[in-house]
Amino acid sequence: MQDAMDFDKFITCNQESCPEYGIVFGSNNTNVLLVKAGQGGSARGYRNKYLKLVHEIRNAYGMSVVCSSTPDTEINQMEHAMQALTKEGLLTADTRIYFVGFSKGASIGCLQGTAFPQITRYLLVNPPMMINLPKICRIAKNYSGEGMAFVFGSEDPSVNLAGLLHLHERENMTVRILPGQDHYLSRDNFDLTDLVAKELLR
């Protein structure tokens, strides 16, 4: 019997430089949530936090959820993810992808994801702003899609640079600071599912 807290399918790669993907399949494949871990992070996340997230989202919304690891690699990881979704039948002409990325995964989503119009909304959590700062700000300024939300813990190293994003804040591009939270959102039993629901799936 399969563990209720496991992925329905796990896709590995025979090269360390390729992302791995954990998938839970929902009844609604028109909407798909893509979760991107931080640098070196696994698809399951520390203490299975992403695995818990995907099951809670699937159960609440009926959507399929894909979690991606984030290896140290030169490949275009968003293009790789789109290819994986297509292969699994999760990316069609009618698919709307909701993206949530953490740390380096948030930066990858911001820098590479806008090339894919199927990604309709972004939740970018604690991206390291000191890396590619001008490009991230330019993308935020020029973003014309449905929604791009930046979220920083008040004690994250990049929070002081979030003010540069505030300059471009508008209806479809928002910036939120979480008081007392660190880079990993690890304090006070933080509810990650609630954050995703309110900032991305609302």
Identify the function of each model-found stretch.
Residues 15-19, 25-67:
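Short, surface-exposed "cap/lid" segments of acyl-processing enzymes
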Residues 48, 136-137, 159-168:
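Short alpha-helix in the alpha/beta-hydrolase fold that links the catalytic acid
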Residues 49, 71-92:
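Alpha/beta-hydrolase active-site loop
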Residues 100-109:
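Gly/Ala-rich beta-loop-alpha elbow adjacent to hydrolase catalytic centers
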Residues 123-132, 153:
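Active-site nucleophile loop of the alpha/beta-hydrolase fold
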Residues 131, 154-159, 183-184:
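Acidic catalytic loop of the alpha/beta-hydrolase fold
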Residues 143-144, 149-152:
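Short beta-strand/loop motif that positions the catalytic acidic residue
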Residues 181-191:
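Catalytic histidine-centered segment of alpha/beta-hydrolase-like enzymes
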